[in-house]
Amino acid sequence: EENMKGYWTIAIFGVDARDNAIEKSTNSDVIILCNINRDTGEIKLVSVYRDSYLNINDKGSYTKINQAYFVGGPKQAVEALNRNLDLQIQDYMTFNWKAVANAIDVLGGVDIELSKAEFYYINSYITETVESTGVGSHHLKKAGPNHLDGVQAVAYARLRKMDTDYARTERQRKVIELSFDKLKKADFAVVNNVMEVVFPQILTSITLNDM
């Protein structure tokens, strides 16, 4: 606990809800611990694999960690992370893919280099993400360097058919890190716009005054 003074850790959950019902009864497909150095502003992200077999409640029930969110929402998911990983996380933030797409669009998109394998699959994920979020986008034309809008960045973070869950979590962290970098460099008007667009769509223990 002494070593964590000056740091703020937030559990970030990305859920597969298609109907904005993000409080529970939906799996947390993304589980990321976001550690913020309050003095320097440095942000470090650590993924928890959604299929990790852990104790999800105080009854000693072992199953995939993403089930904790399904059963008891963010509070039970945070309790499970604290219990299994010996942490003392108090804050959480839950989003669905529409909130992420909207935020990235406000920030002006992100630059990402696509491998040939990623490009092979991404357009089908773009189509699915447009249908599930109602946010417009278009297919990409090539592998290599690409400027991705919100839906395309979400599709990139969701890719999983061509490699491992580890690689998928790397893509998730990359999208979040690039978004955080743009947010830190943005002017007040853009930051305010992001907050106005995103906060009504997410579930969080954090207030705007905490940000």
Could you describe each region identified by the protein language model?
Residues 1-211:
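Non-catalytic, solvent-exposed segments at the cell envelope interface
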